[in-house]
């Protein structure tokens, strides 16, 4: 926006000064006084009271031009286009362009609307106020043009894992030039842009070099435009299609507890995922031929009635047009569980006592079974535990039997304790003393247990 005072008033003042200089002395004083009075009435640049504002509008929308007067004296207001053609003189429209419509006319404002703005309408528009001297102010209309077309192009519709591809995005015919941003999913990437100008319009092309991985399959690549004429997000996208070699995983589906023993059934399932999906999954035995009793059914490997000869490494292989992949499983067959005999009772009979000898059995069954990969160490530990338990049981039985024997002998000798005499002693001289001793012994018995004497 700018304002100016037309030079007609200054020219009049200058002409009056020249005339005063050429006049006679008496008249000269009067002319100078008149000149000073007239100069005080002439408006200067500081007294400019015509104003307007610049306008920015999006192509196809409506622009509003307003010529405003601060201190109106009912002077005429008119509006001119960039070619100095009169659009409105007061409330009259000489220009035959129906897109211009009068919104308001008064002594202090002339407001006009311009509909369906195009890039050709851009430029300076002039407001004029017919004062003495006339005043002029201009406004600039700037037209914003959003991108007419947004295109994204991928070098390859289908890429292979690890390959670098080129992605281009073009925003055509915008004003001013657009800013292009790249996203892969939610992650922003950096591209390289080139700007081409043609007839005050700009075409921007951005290039993105992208190395793809299998995780990028199905992820969108987004081209997003930022422009003052665009509200919200203007974007376009393409979904990546990435091919990758199979990923192989082996799962043991039987036995469920994870420990394989002789005589058990055994089953493995191979899972292979890739793009394109593997068409064939095969089983091989790495260190030997496949057992004859093994059954192969697609991704499943089944072996019935396991034995030690089945030990080895079994491999699942899968392939597609991208490549091959495999996974290994090491099988170790353990001995069958050891059967422990039930507890037994042994009875020994003597003359006066029955001795019962109990055999102590220690349970040697393992409380927890080892993992498949550590099964060999677990089996050796179980065998050692069985040997120690048997030895301990035998020692306990021997000690118990000896204790019982000592108790029996002690009780036997206690029952046969006493004084013994022979027949010869009975007829000897001291026999009377022996009888007396016996009588005294019988008469003086106070204990609960009877004391006896025997003569032989």
Swiss-Prot record:
Disruption phenotype: Male mice are infertile, due to a defect at the spermatid stage of spermatogenesis, and show oligoasthenoteratozoospermia with almost no mature motile spermatozoa in the epididymis. Heterozygous males and females and homozygous null females are fertile and have no overt developmental defects. In the small intestine mucosa and under steady-state conditions, severe reduction in the number of intraepithelial CD4+ CD8+ T-cells and, partial reduction in the number of lamina propria and intraepithelial CD8+ and CD4+ T-cells. Glycans are attached at residues 70, 104, 116, 168, 307, 311. N-glycosylated. Glycosylation at Asn-70 and Asn-104 promotes adhesive binding and synapse induction. Its main location: membrane. Expressed dominantly in epithelial cells but not expressed in fibroblast cells (at protein level). Expressed in the T-cell area of lymph nodes, specifically in CD8+ and CD4- CD8- dendritic cells (at protein level). Expressed in CD8+ dendritic cells in the spleen (at protein level). Expressed in CD103+ dendritic cells in the small intestine lamina propria and mesenteric lymph nodes (at protein level). Expressed in brain, lung, kidney, testis, heart, spleen and liver, but not expressed in skeletal muscle. Residues 147-241, 246-332 form the Ig-like C2-type domain. The chain crosses the membrane at residues 389-409. It is found in: Cell membrane; Synaptic cell membrane. This is Cell adhesion molecule 1. It comes from Mus musculus.
